[in-house]
């Protein structure tokens, strides 16, 4: 698919199959997030894929490794906006108790509309997904303002969300941010 892609996130399932998630800034009609299943053995976390140069400054000029190459993936899916709501960036996927959680940032990263939302799937890492709601938002007294662009950590039996939010008092256009960690709870 010829789309803008950003904020890639690699997820490895229990069977060692790997999935690459990305967002599109929500500028395409009908979808804002995509997922591609990598062919077995295509991505080794201990080695750079063939063609990627260690000099990252030149990588974008030479483009030796076209991430969208059909030969790299065995399955691709654009996740429709009927499954996710207001996708902007920063997809993050994790699995807990057989449920796949697809989390992502929504709104403008410069305002109080920036937030983290999520959807779940019991069928697999490619969905279909069911939208579930918001995880992090600007609170009423704005001590938490514009939270987003997160990751989820699993440490023992606990889950934590690591994200940034605008400095308080609020920074102009959200350019100054704080890194935060909060414990996640599940209903």
What are these regions (language model features)?
Residues 1-187:
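Carbohydrate-active catalytic/glycan-binding domains of CAZyme proteins
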């Amino acid at each position: 698919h010829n789309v803008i892609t950003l904020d890639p996130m690699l997820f490895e399932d229990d069977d060692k199959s790997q999935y690459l998630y990305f967002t599109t800034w929500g500028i395409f009609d009908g979808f804002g997030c995509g997922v591609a299943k990598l062919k077995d053995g295509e991505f080794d976390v201990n080695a750079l894929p063939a063609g990627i140069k260690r000099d990252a400054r030149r990588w974008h000029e030479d483009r030796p490794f076209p991430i969208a190459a059909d030969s790299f993936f065995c399955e691709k899916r654009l996740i429709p906006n009927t499954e996710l709501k207001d996708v902007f960036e920063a997809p993050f996927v994790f699995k807990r108790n057989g449920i796949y959680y697809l989390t992502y940032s929504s709104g403008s990263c410069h305002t109080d509309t920036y937030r983290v939302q999520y959807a779940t799937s019991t069928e697999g890492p490619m969905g279909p997904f069911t939208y579930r709601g918001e995880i992090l938002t600007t609170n009423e007294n704005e001590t938490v303002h514009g939270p987003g662009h997160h990751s989820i950590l699993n440490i023992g039996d606990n889950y934590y969300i690591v994200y940034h939010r605008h400095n308080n008092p609020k920074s102009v256009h959200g350019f100054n941010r704080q890194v935060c960690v909060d414990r996640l709870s599940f209903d």
